[in-house]
Amino acid sequence: MHDSFFKLGFGILAFFIIIALISVFYLPYNPVATTGPLWSPPSLSHPFGTTADGQDLFSQWMYGSQPTLFVAFLSAFISAVFGVAVGISAAYFRRADEPLMRLADVFLILPVLPLLIVIATFVRPTNFSASVIIGLLSWPWMARTVRSSALSVKQSPYIEVAIMSGTPHRSIIKDIFNHTLPLVIANSIFSATGGILFLAYMDYLGVGPITSYAWGTTLFFAQTANALYVGAWWWIVPSGLSIGILATGLSLMGYSLENAYRGISQ
């Protein structure tokens, strides 16, 4: 069952990655140019319809997959780097455990979304800076998970023997990391899911990288044009569904990998 969930999630992710790659080389229309009638519903020439300015929403949807995936993966990578470094250090070095975990606790109680909005209000983020901000605010969950797993590995007999025999710290830490890597990958996928949702929230509220035309930005422009009020559902549904479907696909992959890791570790 978990393997089926993983395959489904991977298929969803692969689909959107393919769309993003295609959009790098080909788009039906310029996503910001007027290329059709205003407020046009879906048709053969415009499969997702057009905006209030006559922009092709299918082209915007394809193009929007790029920044959405970019922020998701980069923020997850940054979160993983900091989370793994803090988690393994806290587990391996006893003196570092208390201060590092208290630092993680401080970040955990921070209201991430309001803080993102406040930061973005003063500094209009780019896709890169948004990824960095999201990643730096998301690492504590990774750190706590990695610490717990690393402590279990450290207490295993062969690691204790390696420590007592004077094996270099670097070699032991590398071995601990290798054992926690599957869990790191699973939690990185969850972090990517969070990155997608945080970016969508920021974009929808108008404080994200507004020129990137990520899916959340499309929803922001639909809101400002009162698309729902005038019945232009086609301006909202594709991007909104894509955010939800991609986040669900990543979550399925993450849960499958996490359950597989816990099954092996037990």
Regions found by a protein language model. Give the residues of each.
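N-terminal signal-anchor/first transmembrane alpha helix
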Residues: 1-31, 103, 245
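Transmembrane-helix boundary motif in ABC transporter permease subunits
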Residues: 23-26, 71-105, 117
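Non-cytoplasmic
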Residues: 117, 126, 131, 135, ...
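Generic hydrophobic transmembrane alpha-helix motif, especially the helices
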Residues: 47-50, 91-92, 96-153
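Transmembrane alpha-helices
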Residues: 66-82, 170-201
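Membrane-cytosol interface at the C-terminal ends of specific transmembrane alpha-helices
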Residues: 76, 125-173, 183-192
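Glycine-rich helix-loop "coupling/hinge" segments at transmembrane-helix boundaries
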Residues: 121-122, 150, 198-238
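C-terminal transmembrane helix and the adjacent membrane-cytosol boundary/short C-terminal tail
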Residues: 137, 189, 232-266
